[in-house]
């Protein structure tokens, strides 16, 4: 999947609107993932799974940092996310389907917070971007 110039512009615009809330929003998306897909909790046995948990907020910030890195390097995601892909494939052994679950909840969370700025075009571009990000993160499983 290739992102068009319009997709890249839309993703950058949406992520800039997220701004300083990126960690909180990604923490919320992770929390939604845990609620919607309980088996995803198995990767975090030490977490407190309540809303506002410090562990979920901390992991949310890590996710936000990874998304920010991906947004900044959309033209070479494979290189930018290589270490993260290695970590998830070889060390953490995260089931690849979990990336799709999280990406779905990222879209839900961003839609709920961006309101009218979450246009159909932004939605489509973010969906493509997150699918590409998931593909890169699971590329080392093969």
From Swiss-Prot:
Tissue: Red blood cells.
Residue intervals of the Globin domain: 2-142
Residues annotated for O2 binding in this entry: 59
Modified residues (N6-acetyllysine): 17
Sequence positions bearing Phosphothreonine: 9, 109, 135, 138
GO cellular component terms listed in the entry, alphabetical order: haptoglobin-hemoglobin complex; hemoglobin complex
MF (Gene Ontology): heme binding; metal ion binding; oxygen binding; oxygen carrier activity
GO process terms (BP): cellular oxidant detoxification; hydrogen peroxide catabolic process
Residues where Phosphoserine is found: 4, 36, 50, 125, 139
Top-level taxon of origin: Eukaryota
Key words, A-Z: Acetylation, Heme, Iron, Metal-binding, Oxygen transport, Phosphoprotein, Transport
Family the entry assigns: Belongs to the globin family.
Function field: Involved in oxygen transport from the lung to the various peripheral tissues.
Subunit structure: Heterotetramer of two alpha chains and two beta chains.
Name of this protein: Hemoglobin subunit alpha
